[in-house]
Design a protein with these regions (language model features):
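Membrane-proximal interfacial segments on either side of biological membranes
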Residues: 1-115, 120-286
């Protein structure tokens, strides 16, 4: 790691601190990332070498400028919730720039350059550490094309996700009764996309979802369509039970070819309720 500090010194000043002007810092280096972000069987992660460079200018002012670059070409990364997987063979360089302002909102812009991903967004941090994400665009030109907005404050996260395509094929209901530690107290998500990819590489349309998560408690309401056919899915999970409800006039359009529903249902319609006991993990299906 290389760090350079530069400043100007006013000669013959009686106040040494006040005599120091135009304080700037420049740093360049690399670090080995090896982060696993959850205890899911298929966890989110980032692995590999990240090259970085950044500069911080006007350190003594009320408007500190920061800009830099993160080169993630030599990393692998995975976000399970939207099945976004970056391979080491893919280029991803992120530029960031912005200003720290004393007693005011600080705004930073993040964008990809010379990359296999299109990423562009704005992050704002208030003087009370309230974080806002504004129109954060993510497009990997394959299975993810989304715009994310939201905020995080006092361990409450709100996210609004819209776009042309979201991939939910790696989202699976895990059955376990392990105790977990939660950083967030409440998570609120609203999702609206033109298309969605379900498990089995099934692509359907008009996906909508509302998700409320309060630590171990979860509430999900979602829907999708394929031509004139409809699917509704809901889930209510608390400390005692985990209830899943699936309703469709033709479920075969929403599941993969290997799914049991394609073999077991005579008329393809379904209205299924599963209630699982979270203590013994036994389920009743009706």
């Amino acid at each position: 790691q290389d760090i350079t500090l530069s400043f100007e010194l006013v000669p013959n000043s009686e106040n040494v601190i006040e005599s120091i002007k135009n304080v700037n810092v420049y740093s360049k280096g690399k670090f080995d990332s090896n982060y696993i972000f959850d205890d899911n069987k298929n966890p989110n992660y980032i692995i590999g070498i990240i090259d970085y460079q950044f500069s911080i200018e006007n350190l003594k002012s009320k408007n500190i400028s920061i800009k830099g670059e993160l080169n993630l070409d030599n990393t692998e990364a995975f976000i399970r919730q939207i099945n976004l997987k970056k391979k080491k063979s893919e280029k991803l360089i992120l530029d960031f720039s912005g200003n720290f302002k004393n007693l005011e909102d600080s705004v930073f812009v993040i964008k990809s350059v010379d990359s296999d991903y299109d990423i562009l967004g704005e992050v704002k941090i208030s003087n009370t550490n309230h974080i806002f994400v504004n129109d954060f665009e993510i497009d990997n030109k394959k299975n993810v094309d989304l715009v994310i907005s939201g905020d995080l404050s006092e361990r409450v996260l709100n996210l609004d996700i819209v776009g042309s395509l979201i991939d939910l094929s790696k989202n699976k209901v895990e059955v376990n009764n392990k105790k977990k530690t939660y950083y967030l107290d409440t998570e609120n998500y609203t999702i609206r996309t033109d298309n969605v990819i379900f498990n089995g590489n099934v692509k359907v349309d008009n996906f909508k979802a509302g998700i409320i998560k309060k630590k171990s408690k979860l509430s999900v309401q979602s829907s999708a369509t394929f031509n004139d056919h409809k699917l509704r899915y809901s889930r209510e999970k608390d400390n005692a039970t985990d209830t899943n409800v699936i309703i469709s006039d033709d479920i075969t359009h929403f599941v993969g070819d290997s799914h049991a529903a394609k073999k077991l249902l005579s008329d393809d319609s379904i209205e299924l309720t599963s209630i699982r006991n979270n203590d013994n993990l036994k389920a009743e299906v009706s």
